[in-house]
Amino acid sequence: MKIVIQRVKRAQVSIDQQLRSSIGQGLLLLVGVGPDDSQEDMDYAVRKIVNMRIFSDAEGKMNLSIKDIDGEILSISQFTLHADTKKGNRPAFVKAAPPEMASNFYDAFNLALQQEVPTRTGIFGADMQVELVNDGPVTIILDTKNR
């Protein structure tokens, strides 16, 4: 799994100019599923995301997790995180999981997140418009294959 984690003041996703989901303070996740991602990868990602201390405490130090601040998550599927850009100028996406596998994995990932933190989503495979107000900005890239 490759996940871009962004700390946000607020975020929302629309599809066909209709608001699908929105959150207040929390995390926007851009989630890419690879063909060899496993339950172990999912468990690792969920554990890292919900416990990562990237929110400021009273002294302004990044010392609080999303759980500590009662924040929310907006999770957006993004297969383009697995783009292969080595050859030519057009990215190839052969390193992304096949759509059916990725969709099921993404749904299970979101259910696991929901057990820990209120989680909203876009729609897998849809053309989405994502709006966010970055906080910091704080942006972290999590790759479950690099641990």
From Swiss-Prot:
The reactions it catalyses are: glycyl-tRNA(Ala) + H2O = tRNA(Ala) + glycine + H(+); a D-aminoacyl-tRNA + H2O = a tRNA + a D-alpha-amino acid + H(+)
Write out the GO biological process terms. D-amino acid catabolic process
Q: Name one Pfam family in it.
A: Tyr_Deacylase
The listed location of motif Gly-cisPro motif, important for rejection of L-amino acids is 136-137
Q: Which GO terms describe its cellular component?
A: cytoplasm
Coiled-coil positions are none
Question: To which protein family does this belong?
Answer: Belongs to the DTD family.
**HAMAP family, from UniProt?**
Deacylase_Dtd
The UniProt function text for this chain reads: An aminoacyl-tRNA editing enzyme that deacylates mischarged D-aminoacyl-tRNAs. Also deacylates mischarged glycyl-tRNA(Ala), protecting cells against glycine mischarging by AlaRS. Acts via tRNA-based rather than protein-based catalysis; rejects L-amino acids rather than detecting D-amino acids in the active site. By recycling D-aminoacyl-tRNA to D-amino acids and free tRNA molecules, this enzyme counteracts the toxicity associated with the formation of D-aminoacyl-tRNA entities in vivo and helps enforce protein L-homochirality.
**Identification of the protein by name:** D-aminoacyl-tRNA deacylase
Lineage here is: Bacteria, Bacillati, Bacillota, Bacilli, Lactobacillales
